[in-house]
Amino acid sequence: MMENNRNYFIAIALSVLIVLGWQFLYMNPRIEAQRKAQEAQKAQQQTEQVQQPAAGGATPAPASGTAPSGQAVATATLEQALAKTPRVAIDTPALSGSINLAGARLDDLKLKGYHETVDDSSPIITLFSPAETKDGYFTELGYIGSDATGSVPGASTLWTAPEGAKLTEKTPVTLSYTNDKGLTFTRTISVDERYMFTIADKVANTGQAPVSLSSYGRVTRYNKPTTPSAYVLHEGFIGVIGDDGLIESKYTAVEKEAVMPAKSTGGWLGITDKYWAATIVPPQASAYEARFSHFSDGQPRYQADYKDDAFTVAPGQSVELKNLVFAGAKEVPVIDGYEASYSIPRFDRLIDWGWFYFITKPMFKLMDFFFRFFGNFGVAILCTTIVVKALFFPLASKQYASMANMKRMQPKMEELKAKFGDDRMGLQQATMQLYKEEKINPIAGCWPVALQIPIFFSLYKVIYITIEMRHAPFFGWIQDLSAPDPTTIVNLFGLLPFTAPTFLHLGVWPLIMGVTMFLQMRMNPTPPDPTQAMIFNWMPLVFMFMLASFPAGLVIYWAWNNTLSVIQQSVIMKRHGVKIELFDNLKGLFRRKTAPSK
């Protein structure tokens, strides 16, 4: 049968099997192992060492500082940690939590709009936790002074706040601290309706001599996330810093060596997870040194921090600084809005769109358009697939036209094979001459394949990384498009009282995908080569099991794409007068072979 068509499926198979094999053989066992470890960890009470903030406002290891040794204490529960220090409540439509007046830290933050599971009664997502807890995670801004400045705000500085103060999207909170050298620090914290905090500081010198000091900011995380990371997206340190541009560093890389970009002006830095992130946007007009680092004193600590150049405050004068802190969900419209409204360079790269950024992000935009119209991301995936198919229809038409021409040439090709026999060189030259006479480009059918592969990976990226897909339902039993199909045929979809092993997990949608792939491959004659025929016969079954562990949204896309491909190929082949082989192939597949007569 037509060589181009065989190459089509082989190219798709080889490209996709890389991702499928990695997911099936590497990620699934890793996820299962970490899930069991997490359960065991919750069942066991542990006493661990954590680092206590240094007293007296000492520098908490900013870009050019030294990590304090601290005092080891037993890990506290969240309730115990919150009760240790005075706090100012945070309550907005998207966030709840509190500001720790010791250090003015953002170390208690929950995301109201997101739950841990699809069950709305499950706990909401906790982003920040105090340093004393096992999984401490927080942001902090402070100063580095000298003997002349006296004690400046640091990790343990106790700020004062008005009685009854509460931070909401409409009511900022003003904190203050005055030291014995006549320096008064005033910090006004405001937050919008989503996830951006604006922290405006004013340093006033009421003393008799000028003083010089520097400011710093840091995002600190104790321990790595408990959820397994994936090579398909970046999790860890991230930032856009001066001439270095976008910097992405994995936790394991920073454990080996700290990352210290060149001193720069502008940009941002922080720590990102799959769906959540915490970043600091330093004062954009000041030069600063940034660093991604890891400390193992006490409890493992990962830190993204910066320290700016020293500034001088003359007697009777004041200096104002402004930092932005993003802490929340990586919602695409919100991130894009912050990039535009605050002029934050390349802030949209906080979402890992991947190498095919120029395809992946527009594809999400198209999908989001359909979601806003239909209110269902599953339907949006179906509509996006139709649009992509329509855009590629001219290329697909050329591909099948080339295939039709190749099929009409089959009798002549057979004559050449019979004529040249084992003379491969002569056969190749005669074949190329035949192509030239018939004005046929034998590789014309490859371009649609080459263009569709980035489309597939881009769609996979959209479904896998965007928080909009998280817990997004389709219809029926699919309540989370970003998770695998929860049903499994092995236990008759729950009728039999046992849980199937991960490698045998085969849901309804993977089964549908396998059937549609089988039908698509039967649109063309069976390859004469036995090896290729065997590959074609087994490919739908292999893909069916391997895709079972992929997000349901991707499997639905693939099943729908196969269905549209069958329809599209039928239309195009009919237009070019090429016989549709589907029904003949199905009849031939199920027709019993008769024994040869003696």
From Swiss-Prot:
Membrane topology for this entry?
Multi-pass membrane protein
Q: Could you tell me the superkingdom of the organism this chain comes from?
A: Bacteria
**Which Pfam families does the UniProt entry name for this protein?**
60KD_IMP (PF02096), YidC_periplas (PF14849)
Give the Low complexity compositional bias ranges. 40-71
- The UniProt entry lists the main location of this chain as membrane
| Gene Ontology, cellular component aspect | plasma membrane
Keywords assigned by UniProt?
Cell inner membrane, Cell membrane, Chaperone, Membrane, Protein transport, Transmembrane, Transmembrane helix, Transport
Q: Name one GO molecular function term.
A: membrane insertase activity
Annotated Gene3D superfamilies: 2.70.98.90
List the transmembrane segments: 7-27, 373-393, 447-467, 492-512, 538-558
Q: Region Disordered: start and end of each range?
A: 37-71
Name the Gene Ontology biological process terms: protein insertion into membrane; protein transport
Task: Read off the InterPro entries from this record.
Answer: Membr_insert_YidC, Membr_insert_YidC_N, YidC/ALB3/OXA1/COX18, YidC/Oxa/ALB_C, YidC_ALB_C, YidC_periplasmic_sf
Where in or outside the cell?
A: Cell inner membrane
Family assignment?
Belongs to the OXA1/ALB3/YidC family. Type 1 subfamily.
**Subunit annotation:** Interacts with the Sec translocase complex via SecD. Specifically interacts with transmembrane segments of nascent integral membrane proteins during membrane integration.
Function field: Required for the insertion and/or proper folding and/or complex formation of integral membrane proteins into the membrane. Involved in integration of membrane proteins that insert both dependently and independently of the Sec translocase complex, as well as at least some lipoproteins. Aids folding of multispanning membrane proteins.
Q: What is this protein called?
A: Membrane protein insertase YidC
Q: Which organism is it from?
A: Rhizobium etli (strain CIAT 652)
Q: Please name the gene that encodes this protein.
A: yidC
